[in-house]
């Protein structure tokens, strides 16, 4: 593979591997290679097939496989039997239904970095890494694993709402609740609810301007990091889905922002007034709502720089940039 010109985590210029800042956030300060010692699961080698079918498989959400990695002796490797994965590995999906599927890891990485760097949203630490055959994969550090290896209690919003396929149907992650209902979940379970309602509001706004229509109930969760209080977990699974889906939606949740649903037509989709009403409904002060909508209505030069330095193709960079700028404009 070609030598890198940007840190594959922070996207800072002048680095051919992970920068010191990235190593601190992801690896406890250890210098770690960005190249894995095995091939992509999309490669037909026996080694990659064994990994995909037998080692470290966590789940399959939609069409995107997830695997596990551990950090040992300065390298990321597959976990042995009985080892708890410290990192989640997401290679490019194999589904031919997706457009430009090999760039899914770069898309998720860019979107997560935009959230953290340009908008100050707390996110799971993340980066790109590369298989031995050169294919990129997305890696994120598990925030539900304590330093001693134990697991912090964590519940996604579908579980907290008591929704399953049995009582909510096969579309239960998307078709039952609204984002206003999600705010009620925060209010019910989080002691410092007002703080997390603001954090939630900002993530919903960010998902809108970055065209993430896969922010379903399992992509929000509450976590207790050992002090007995649940709080909104760091943002995860942020991605501009419009780059890969043939018929993208505006919101993942079919009801949209409001409990009664949203009537969207060819002449009215979503604008600033909808988010202002949403902010008020979930209990945020008007001045705070205005401040946040103003923030997300303004195109971030830092975000544009991240798009330009990302590992997307030039064509996808252009599409991402244009769609992001347009969504910001709709909030003015």
Ranges and model annotations:
Residues 125, 282-295:
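Short, surface-exposed acidic
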Residues 1-47, 53, 188, 230-232, ...:
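Regulatory N- and C-terminal appendages and interdomain linkers associated
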Residues 132, 136-209, 265, 274, ...:
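ATP-dependent phospho-/nucleotidyl transfer catalytic cores
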Residues 131, 291-301:
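Small/polar glycine-rich anion-binding or flexible loop at a beta-alpha turn
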Residues 69, 115, 157, 214, ...:
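A residue-level signal for conserved active-site and pocket-lining positions in enzyme catalytic cores
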Residues 46-169:
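Conserved ATP-binding subdomain of kinase catalytic cores across diverse folds
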Residues 102-119, 175-246:
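Conserved kinase catalytic-core segment
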Residues 158-185, 225-286:
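Catalytic-core segments of enzymes that bind and process phosphorylated/nucleotide-bearing substrates
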């Amino acid at each position: 593979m070609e030598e890198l010109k940007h840190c594959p985590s922070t996207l800072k210029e002048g680095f051919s591997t992970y920068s010191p800042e990235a190593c601190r956030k992801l690896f406890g300060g250890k210098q770690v290679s960005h190249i894995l010692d095995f091939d992509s699961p999309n490669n037909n080698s026996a080694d990659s097939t064994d990994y995909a079918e037998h080692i470290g498989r966590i789940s399959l959400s939609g069409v995107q496989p997830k695997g596990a990695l551990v950090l040992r002796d300065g390298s990321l490797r597959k976990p042995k039997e009985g080892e708890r994965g410290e990192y989640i590995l997401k290679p490019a999906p194999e589904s031919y239904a997706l457009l430009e599927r090999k760039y899914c890891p770069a898309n998720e990485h860019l979107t997560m970095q935009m959230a953290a760097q340009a908008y100050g949203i707390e996110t799971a630490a993340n980066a790109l890494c590369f298989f031995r055959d050169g294919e990129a994969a997305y890696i994120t550090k598990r925030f539900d694993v304590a330093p001693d290896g134990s697991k912090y209690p964590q519940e996604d919003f579908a579980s907290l709402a008591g929704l399953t396929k049995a009582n909510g149907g096969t579309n239960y992650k998307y078709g039952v609740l609204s984002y206003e209902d999600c705010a009620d979940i925060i209010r019910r379970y989080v002691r410092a609810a007002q703080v997390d309602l603001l954090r939630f509001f900002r993530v919903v706004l960010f998902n809108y301007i970055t065209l993430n229509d896969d922010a379903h109930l399992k992509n929000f969760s509450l976590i207790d990091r050992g002090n007995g209080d649940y709080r909104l977990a760091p943002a995860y699974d942020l991605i501009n889905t419009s780059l890969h889906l043939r018929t993208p939606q505006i919101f993942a949740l079919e009801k949209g922002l409001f409990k009664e649903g949203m009537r969207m037509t060819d002449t009215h989709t979503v604008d600033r007034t909808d988010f202002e009403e949403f902010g008020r409904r979930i209990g945020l002060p008007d001045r705070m709502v205005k401040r946040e909508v103003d923030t997300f209505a303004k195109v971030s030069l830092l975000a544009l720089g991240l798009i330009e330095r990302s590992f997307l193709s030039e064509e996808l960079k252009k599409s991402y940039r244009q769609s992001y700028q347009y969504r910001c404009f709709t909030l003015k």
